[in-house]
Amino acid sequence: MKTATTTASHACPFCSGKGYFQLILGGSETCPSCQGTGKDSHSFSSR
């Protein structure tokens, strides 16, 4: 039997919920999509 695990808060799809990217030449940069929060900022809100 297969089970799927889900989390209550949706992680940012661009940085995988980390809030930053590791740069190839060293260092890190804040994720421009979630502004470093690690949460998906593209969720829909009701009006």
Curated annotation (Swiss-Prot):
InterPro entries: DUF5351, HSP_DnaJ_Cys-rich_dom_sf. SUPFAM superfamilies: DnaJ/Hsp40 cysteine-rich domain. This is Uncharacterized protein YuiA. The lineage of its organism: Bacteria, Bacillati, Bacillota, Bacilli, Bacillales. The gene is yuiA.
